[in-house]
Amino acid sequence: MYKRQLEKRPRLAFRNTDGSHFPCWRQTPLGCIIEPYSEKVYGEHDYEVLTSAREGLQRQEDHFGSKQRHDTDGYNIIPFGYCTYRNRSDDGKFAFNINTISEKAIVSKFYPVFRFTNANSTFMAEFLNSSPRVKKKLSVLAVGTSQVVLSFEALKAAKFDLPCKDEQDKIAAFLECLNTRIENQRTLVAALKKYKRGVVC
C-alpha cells in the first residue's frame, strides 16, 4: 500500500533560486566530464588499501575482516574526493564510489581512478549507481561471459542525458539530506536493537 502511494507522488522538479526552470537535460558523453588520474605506488609506502564495494569505498581490513597481505606494486593512488569502480562484475552491475574516507589511499590496479569536471561528483555517483537507464546501458557496454568487464574507455564513451551543473548541485544537496536521514535512521535502529537485547538479559 505504502509503495503504491509513493509511486503516485508527482515527480520532483528542481528550479533556480529565482523560481525559473533549469535548461533541459542534454546528452553528454561521460568522457567530456571525466578527468582520468594516473599515479601508482611501488615498494614500501604508507598508503592504506581501499576496496570498492557496492556498499561504498571501504578500508580493506574492514571489508575482509582482517588486513590482507599481497603485493601492492602498481596499485593506483586515489586522492580524496576522486572516484573509482571495480571494472569486473559477475552480474553486470557496477558500483561507482568516491573516496571520502582517506587522504592517503590506494586501490587495485584494475580500478580506474578519475574525477568529474564541470559536474557534481555526488550527483554523478548517485546517477551512475541508481538510474535504471544507466545500469541497463552499462550492462550492455560490458563485455565477457561469466564475468563481464566495463572498460574505462567504454565508460567514457557512454552518453547520457544530464542536467546542467547548477541543477546537479541542487539535486546533490537534496540527496545528501536524504543520505543523512538514512544514516540517522540506521543509528536509531541499531540503538533500538541494542535496547531490545537488554530487555531480555
Predicted features along the sequence, with ranges:
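Non-catalytic DNA-recognition/assembly elements of restriction-modification systems
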Residues: 13-41, 165
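A short glycine-rich beta-alpha junction/loop motif
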Residues: 105-110, 143-166
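Extracellular/lumenal glycan-associated surfaces
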Residues: 169-181
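Amphipathic alpha-helical coiled-coil segments
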Residues: 178, 182-185, 189-192
